[in-house]
């Protein structure tokens, strides 16, 4: 009998030691915020090496495209952010902006995933808020805002990126990470959230793929005055610089960057493709500043 008690006590002690060891191992695991950062690093690197992002980081994306960065957010932003977004959208596209933009296939897939998570796995929304605010609005998007803001700076078109109650973005991010690390989640749930954050990168890479495909297709449009243009391919083109000289409307063997840009910007699908990807691009920039 005595030996049985001793054996039971030994088993209990062993289990306690095992649990203590497991707890200690968990404590040695990086903080949740670090798990998110490290867990998405590979996907982030792959996204960073897409052609669109490479061009962006090289400064080959025109500043005018910044206004499109707000559009995708109007589909997926939290309700409390819509007031600022609405002001930006009205500034860029007019009061009837909702009639002028259209969600692309890849962007819609991303939006559908966010809606699914919100309804079925709400804890996984942490992954999307992390990638949006830690990697985007409070980091890379601030860089984008500085690059595209008018001189002198006004608030027009950048309301969404202005956080009146956040005086120091770096300190706020530290506070946000501390809150992340304080979440009462088991390791399995944390790992699933990291997987969801990785999915966010995958969805954005699908959008980048759409961008690359759209950028490789010549865009043909007809101007209001009837002149046909073939943008980016040296075809018929009419720039504002020679608009007063119709006989010089054809630029043999040369490109018309103005019309090329304007024609692309008028394409609703391309607008949404470009815009939906800007948040992640901003996140990629954030890695250089975190």
Curated annotation (Swiss-Prot):
In the record, biological process GO terms are:
heme catabolic process; heme oxidation; response to oxidative stress
Q: Which Pfam family, giving just one, matches this sequence?
A: Heme_oxygenase
Q: Which InterPro entries match?
A: Haem_Oase (IPR002051), Haem_Oase-like (IPR016053), Haem_Oase-like_multi-hlx (IPR016084), Haem_oxygenase_CS (IPR018207)
Q: Where on the tree of life does the source sit, at the highest rank?
A: Eukaryota
What keywords sit in the KW lines?
A: Heme, Iron, Metal-binding, Oxidoreductase, Repeat
Tell me the ranges holding the HRM repeats: 238-243, 255-260
- GO MF annotation terms: heme binding; heme oxygenase (decyclizing) activity; metal ion binding
Q: Known EC number(s)?
A: 1.14.14.18
Question: Which segments carry the region annotation Disordered?
Answer: 1-33
Q: Write down the chemical reaction(s) this protein catalyses.
A: heme b + 3 reduced [NADPH--hemoprotein reductase] + 3 O2 = biliverdin IXalpha + CO + Fe(2+) + 3 oxidized [NADPH--hemoprotein reductase] + 3 H2O + H(+)
- The residue ranges flagged as biased composition, category Acidic residues, are 1-12
Tissue and organ distribution: Found in the spleen, liver, thymus, prostate, heart, kidney, brain and testis.
| Function per UniProt | Heme oxygenase cleaves the heme ring at the alpha methene bridge to form biliverdin. Biliverdin is subsequently converted to bilirubin by biliverdin reductase. Heme oxygenase 3 could be implicated in some heme-dependent regulatory role in the cell.
What's the family? Belongs to the heme oxygenase family.
Q: What is this protein's record name?
A: Putative heme oxygenase 3
């Amino acid at each position: 009998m005595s030996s049985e008690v001793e054996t039971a006590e030994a088993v209990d002690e062993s289990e306690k030691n095992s649990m203590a060891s497991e707890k200690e191992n968990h404590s040695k695991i990086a903080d949740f915020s670090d798990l998110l950062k490290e867990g998405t690093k590979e996907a982030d690197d792959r996204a960073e090496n897409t052609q669109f992002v490479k061009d962006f980081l090289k400064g080959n994306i025109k500043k005018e495209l910044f206004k499109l960065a707000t559009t995708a957010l109007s589909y997926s932003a939290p309700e409390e952010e819509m007031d600022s977004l609405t002001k930006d959208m009205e500034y860029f596209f007019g009061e009837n902006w909702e009639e002028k933009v259209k969600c692309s296939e890849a962007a819609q897939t991303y939006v559908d995933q966010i809606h699914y998570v919100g309804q079925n796995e709400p804890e996984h929304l942490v992954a999307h808020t992390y990638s949006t605010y830690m990697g985007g609005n409070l980091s890379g998007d601030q860089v984008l805002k500085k690059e595209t803001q008018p001189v002198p700076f006004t608030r027009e078109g950048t309301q969404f990126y202005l956080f009146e109650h956040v005086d120091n973005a770096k300190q706020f991010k530290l506070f946000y990470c501390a809150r992340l690390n304080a979440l009462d989640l088991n390791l399995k749930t944390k790992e699933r959230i990291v997987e969801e954050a990785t999915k966010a990168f995958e969805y954005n890479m699908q959008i980048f793929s759409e961008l690359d495909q759209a950028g490789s297709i010549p865009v043909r449009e007809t101007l209001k005055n009837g002149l046909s243009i073939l943008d980016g391919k040296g075809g018929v083109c009419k720039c504002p610089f020679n608009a007063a000289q119709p006989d010089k409307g054809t630029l043999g063997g040369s490109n018309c960057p103005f019309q090329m840009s304007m024609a692309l910007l008028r394409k609703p699908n391309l607008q949404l493709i470009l815009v939906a990807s800007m948040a992640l691009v901003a996140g990629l920039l954030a890695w250089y500043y975190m």
